[in-house]
A protein has these predicted regions:
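Short linear motifs in intrinsically disordered
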Residues: 107, 128-129, 156-164
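Short, solvent-exposed, Trp/other aromatic-anchored flexible loops in extracytoplasmic proteins
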Residues: 149-157
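Structural signature of eukaryotic scaffold interfaces centered on beta-propeller domains
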Residues: 39-42, 107-110, 163
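Bacterial Sec-dependent N-terminal signal peptides
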Residues: 1-25
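Short, exposed beta-strand-loop hairpins at the edges of beta-sheets
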Residues: 160-185
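Mature extracytoplasmic domains of secretory-pathway proteins
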Residues: 82-150
């Protein structure tokens, strides 16, 4: 009976802190950091994808950057910010070092109206921002040898330093634009 009470208390605590318990990710890999809950950021019409990583639930969000008239900001088409779930869940801008050396993006306009998007810290993973037939913008990536809509990236880090973290793997998740089926790939950068 006591164990049941403890289990229910923990379940209710998670629900209170993060909302619906169905909107969380478990830590892929589940060894160090297995007790970290990775909430799914709130749904937004501008959401492109988000990145989560050990050692905490703080999430880096990548949204479409629209001007006040609702059109794409062609100079900086993606805005990047934190959701600090490990604190109070507040939204915060990336600092200069995070933006220029870690989680920021570069964007280069292509002739066809699309954008070549790259992480400043890992340029070997090309992304493409493009408008699809439904008129919405999405970030596309090559995942498991398929061009899919990128939804989430999880980075498993064990040790190292800020400037040179020991990345065990990167897990990328996306959805097939034709079937909606989830596609997942894990790689070591």
């Amino acid at each position: 009976m006591r164990l049941l009470f403890i289990f229910l208390f923990c379940l209710l605590s998670i629900t209170f802190v993060y909302g619906d318990t169905k909107t969380v990710h478990k830590n892929p890999g589940s060894d160090k950091g297995a007790n970290v809950v990775y909430p799914v950021p709130p749904i937004s019409n501008e959401r492109l994808f988000y990145v989560q990583r050990t050692p905490n639930a703080n999430t880096i969000v990548y949204d479409l950057n629209l001007n006040s008239d609702g059109k794409l900001n062609t100079e900086q088409p993606v805005k990047v910010y934190w959701l600090k779930y490990a604190e109070k869940g507040q939204k915060e801008e990336l600092n200069y070092i995070q933006r220029k050396f870690a989680y920021g993006l570069t964007a280069k306009a292509l002739n066809n109206g699309n954008y070549d998007i790259r992480f400043v810290s890992y340029k070997k993973f090309p992304l493409t921002l493009m408008r699809t037939g439904d008129g919405k913008y999405h970030i596309f990536a090559l995942i498991a040898q398929k061009q899919v809509i990128l939804n989430r990236i999880f980075v498993k880090i064990e040790g190292g330093s800020f400037w040179l973290p020991n990345v065990m793997y990167v897990e990328v998740k996306g959805s097939d634009p034709l079937t909606g089926r989830e596609i997942v790939e894990r790689f070591k950068p």
